[in-house]
Amino acid sequence: MALDCLLLFLLASAVAAMEETLMDTRTATAELGWTANPASGWEEVSGYDENLNTIRTYQVCNVFEPNQNNWLLTTFINRRGAHRIYTEMRFTVRDCSSLPNVPGSCKETFNLYYYETDSVIATKKSAFWSEAPYLKVDTIAADESFSQVDFGGRLMKVNTEVRSFGPLTRNGFYLAFQDYGACMSLLSVRVFFKKCPSIVQNFAVFPETMTGAESTSLVIARGTCIPNAEEVDVPIKLYCNGDGEWMVPIGRCTCKAGYEPENSVACKACPAGTFKASQEAEGCSHCPSNSRSPSEASPICTCRTGYYRADFDPPEVACTSVPSGPRNVISIVNETSIILEWHPPRETGGRDDVTYNIICKKCRADRRSCSRCDDNVEFVPRQLGLTECRVSISSLWAHTPYTFDIQAINGVSSKSPFPPQHVSVNITTNQAAPSTVPIMHQVSATMRSITLSWPQPEQPNGIILDYEIRYYEKEHNEFNSSMARSQTNTARIDGLRPGMVYVVQVRARTVAGYGKFSGKMCFQTLTDDDYKSELREQLPLIAGSAAAGVVFVVSLVAISIVCSRKRAYSKEAVYSDKLQHYSTGRGSPGMKIYIDPFTYEDPNEAVREFAKEIDVSFVKIEEVIGAGEFGEVYKGRLKLPGKREIYVAIKTLKAGYSEKQRRDFLSEASIMGQFDHPNIIRLEGVVTKSRPVMIITEFMENGALDSFLRQNDGQFTVIQLVGMLRGIAAGMKYLSEMNYVHRDLAARNILVNSNLVCKVSDFGLSRYLQDDTSDPTYTSSLGGKIPVRWTAPEAIAYRKFTSASDVWSYGIVMWEVMSFGERPYWDMSNQDVINAIEQDYRLPPPMDCPAALHQLMLDCWQKDRNSRPRFAEIVNTLDKMIRNPASLKTVATITAVPSQPLLDRSIPDFTAFTTVDDWLSAIKMVQYRDSFLTAGFTSLQLVTQMTSEDLLRIGVTLAGHQKKILSSIHSMRVQMNQSPSVMA
């Protein structure tokens, strides 16, 4: 109450500006003690004001004497921090014309001066009497003067004048009055300054504020919100003008949540049973249905037991409950497809956002145990968040029992500690056709044929009788397609046109009929030039083979002759000269060999020889997609004459480059231009005759492999991942056969197109690893920069880069792919990685990695580089895995490789975690933090009781993420069982 009264007082007192008096002669009861010079000038006398109060005044009237210069100096006046001073003077002046015989020197005005100083410097003995040290304020003239008649009638006409001066910076000042021939009386002098008063405005208190140094000055005053009020938007402030008045309000305060305004000067707490949710709300409101606020100042009403409020529900909305289960389920089974229909729940919980989730479980024949359905089961329109009471489920196993739980959920189901209400239905599927073939690979191609291979479907659902292949030219539609059949999982398609791209699909057939066609994949026949080039490359090999055959026959004849003559010539001298051996190089005669562009005397000649110059008018830049070592990378389009427009990636050379930077930039084009393989990034050409200089390559829609895998964690099958690895290995096989060593093979340098085809890229860094000083991936070794985690030990120690060291790097890429882009060696330092490798430690298998693939990784990581497989062997091994998917069923474990020490990414010590947030951060699943907390899993003890159905219910739908979280929960449960105190 006292505070409210104070605020009301401040508000009422804000009507007028405040004046603080520094000196007022009207209040003096003794002599003023001012200094006059000369003594015959100003005279202090006692008098009466208009109210007959006794006052001390000064008067002067030497009008009959010429050359008057009478000074009156006040005592020292302390300015008290004021910057501008006001002086109010009340005085009377005799009219000169009313004085008889007055000389012409009679005046009716006087001058006002001031002098700043930090201390008292003027006394009666040491006063200064000249205009020099003073600053003149003004010449003061009377508005009215009095005459002899007025004087006789005691009618004094009093003048009041106010003058201001400033800015002042010293501690105080003196005032001086100069008379130079007037007959006047200085009745009173009041010296004061102005300030803006304390005020309450917009629920904020503003303190007393002095005016500025100038009459036009505006002084900012920051306001303070009254109790239980808060600022809105910008900081609240007012401006104090030169007249001591408030103006230009900026910002405001309002009563905070739980408080409402009272008389515009106070914020009162909302009473029990009411609430105010935000500052913006006008006043308190009654609690909505199924909620209450037992105490005052409630910003929100809490829901009663069994009722909840969704995160997106405003506080004004009533609390609601969870729905009951769906009703009256109807199922329709068609081979391996099912249609489920049901009626909505009887109770919706008071909400209209009811949706449905389908939980699929595959069971044993006796239904005593069930497990989560495979990831390839398809739900139409979707599995989670269904808005209609119908779903179509396909790609189920044939002759298999299933249980489907249909959950009813609404916006508050995640708030309930209990699982959603559901209804279950048990179903057994019928005989079905095989599933789709996952992928196809090109074995070889001629001008008029293509040879393809593929693995059998993951769900054959019986014995595969044969395969049907559908193909057509890409420029046509599938209505013009042709068909071919094969008894095996390979086929040669003949009768094709040279240089054409064909779209191919394949499907398997069992006694139940044909399965669905596989996804569309594109393959191209050779052009006439390709065929002749291949023939030219193979001709020397054929000739060499024929020559070798002739030599072999001649050798046999010669040996027989020598043997027949051996006895006759046994006594002849034995030749003592040794045969001379000459090395002719590793490549077979006629094989295309990579040429280092830096062996050219003029590197620009290599660009002209290996890269096609493109007119810049054929190139259209669209958007920035990244930044490279030399400049920005763009997505664009290329339209060459006579060819269709295609999307391309455009690397540019930034402005201000040196000639060396230009050569280094274009060297990558000189390297890429020598390669022609479906798993090597294709160079379209270069632009060197205009600015900026550009390297134009094919556009890869899915970007770098490592980030692509992380974005799609758990969404690819093992056979799809093996298909990606096979493509990378095929590209590296091609490079190794050309005697090209990549040196920087890693998932970040593999690009992925829209068909999941992987292509080796980034040939610019392979020569200049030592020049990179910024990327932490590349660590110093022997004066250079090396990507330690991907590099073979001999390359780290001795900079010995070979195709065998690329094989080591390929093993790391395999590990990256099977772990969906996880960082090799995790958070180990580069030096720890080097030490571990030297001690023969190797990476363990990623989660759910087939044992055959991990064994291939270990083969690639043999310490003896000569013991590592060649890329041709790796391609053959992967092809066998693709043809026989059963070989990938066995999952690798650390204990399965006793002869090889493996690094063990230590399981986090769950006893060190105190919150669910800490645990999710440790296992890199922090994106699900809100889902866990919203669903009520707020402690680690509750988390250890979670199942796969719980994860699905809270929104963890990716299989890879589910496995990772469930594996961590299992480890946590084991640790907690071993340390019971953790559960406390």
From Swiss-Prot:
Phosphorylated. Autophosphorylation is stimulated by the ligand EFNB1. Required for interaction with SH2 domain-containing interactors, for activation of the MAPK/ERK and JUN signaling cascades and for ubiquitination by CBL. Ubiquitinated; (EFNB1)ligand-induced poly- and/or multi-ubiquitination by CBL is regulated by SRC and leads to lysosomal degradation. It comes from the Eukaryota. GO terms for biological process: angiogenesis; axon guidance; camera-type eye morphogenesis; cell chemotaxis; cell-substrate adhesion; central nervous system projection neuron axonogenesis; cranial nerve development; dendritic spine development. Pfam families: EphA2_TM, Ephrin_lbd, fn3, PK_Tyr_Ser-Thr, SAM_1. ATP binds at I625, G626, A627, G628, E629, F630, G631, E632, V633, K651. One of its GO terms (molecular function) is axon guidance receptor activity. Residues 1-17 form the signal peptide. It is a single-pass type I membrane protein. Heterotetramer upon binding of the ligand. The heterotetramer is composed of an ephrin dimer and a receptor dimer. Oligomerization is probably required to induce biological responses. Interacts with EPHB6; transphosphorylates EPHB6 to form an active signaling complex. Interacts with PICK1. Interacts (through Tyr-594) with NCK1 (via SH2 domain); activates the JUN cascade to regulate cell adhesion. The ligand-activated form interacts (through Tyr-928) with GRB7 and GRB10 (via SH2 domains). The ligand-activated form interacts (residues within the catalytic domain) with GRB2 (via SH2 domain). This is Ephrin type-B receptor 1. It comes from Rattus norvegicus (Rat).
